Amino acid sequence: MVGKILIDTNVLLDYLLEREPFFEDAKKVISSCTEGNTKGCIAAHSISNMFFILRKDYTAKERREILSNLCTIFDVEGIDKAKLLSGLANEEFSDFEDCLQMECAKSYGAEYIVTRNVSDYSVSNIKAILPSEYLGL
């Protein structure tokens, strides 16, 4: 496996919501981090996004517990003023949130962004790969 990865929100949601056919690969990616094979990171803004998205499936108390657990498993890379300004200046990204994910991955020193939306990162400085590609490394 590789040294450091940033796990995109969609992969985390695949795991938390057991979305098929993506759940098994997402589970294996997360397991590689919990077992110490890889250092995994999530962007801090992914937590707030997931708190909102998960509201249909979990109570507020359950969401707090689930997301707190993720924060103990993974390193969390925050968004500061410099990352925001860098992201805002980057006109190549069509999706600002993806640009912020890339900024977090870059700051963390990630080798890869593990995502199901590889095409969203076509202009990223950090290579984006599918969970299945990551598992094959």
Q: Residue ranges of each PLM-predicted region?
A:
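Short, well-structured N-terminal submotif of metal-dependent ribonuclease cores
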Residues: 1-41, 55-62, 123, 136-137
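Acidic, PIN/NYN-like endoribonuclease modules and their adjacent C-terminal/linker elements
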Residues: 2-4, 106-137
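A general alpha-helix detector
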Residues: 11-12, 49-50, 86
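Short, flexible helix/strand-to-coil boundary loops that buttress conserved ligand/catalytic motifs
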Residues: 16, 88-91, 125
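Short, conserved alpha-helical segments within structured domains
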Residues: 42-46, 83
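Short acidic, glycine/proline-enriched helix-loop-strand junctions
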Residues: 61-84, 121-137
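Active-site neighborhoods of divalent-metal-dependent phosphate/nucleic-acid chemistry enzymes
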Residues: 75-118
